[in-house]
Amino acid sequence: TLMRKTVALLISFLCCFSLAAQDLYEQYIATYSDAAVAEMYRSGVPASITLAQGLLESGMGRSTLAVQANNHFGIKCHGWTGMKVYHDDDAKDECFRKYESVEDSYKDHSDFLRYKDRYKFLFDLEPTDYKGWCYGLKSAGYATDPSYANKLINIIEKYRLYEFDRPQ
């Protein structure tokens, strides 16, 4: 019947769409995992946290900020003296940091967490305590979304990003 064909087509479409989204996540991870691990060794920020935040904040590297400003973490200007871009976020025309490369964004994200007083307590956690880091980022005010920590945890667990936190 027409109804069965429509339902079958819809299910096929949803499966393909889901697989395509999963492929985008995996593509992002494959592209930036080395940078995240390098930052973990340099700064102490777990690679799982960097990757999960990068995935979430940049829409898998496809957000306007990621594409136009190489800003994969949604970091705003606040005292920034480098290049800037203006983008609507919580308010209209907010100032965001702009980077020469995605790797510069990753480095600045690590330094942002490492040297801002409100995040210092995170570095007392074990690097493998990704849940502690996620809840800590939320409690320190990294994002306004009440589900932020859980979203990060879901990404980390679904894509096994915690495996990047273990010394090789």
Region annotations inferred by a language model:
Residues 1-24:
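Bacterial Sec-dependent N-terminal signal peptides
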Residues 19-168:
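Catalytic cores of secreted/periplasmic lytic hydrolases that degrade extracellular macromolecules
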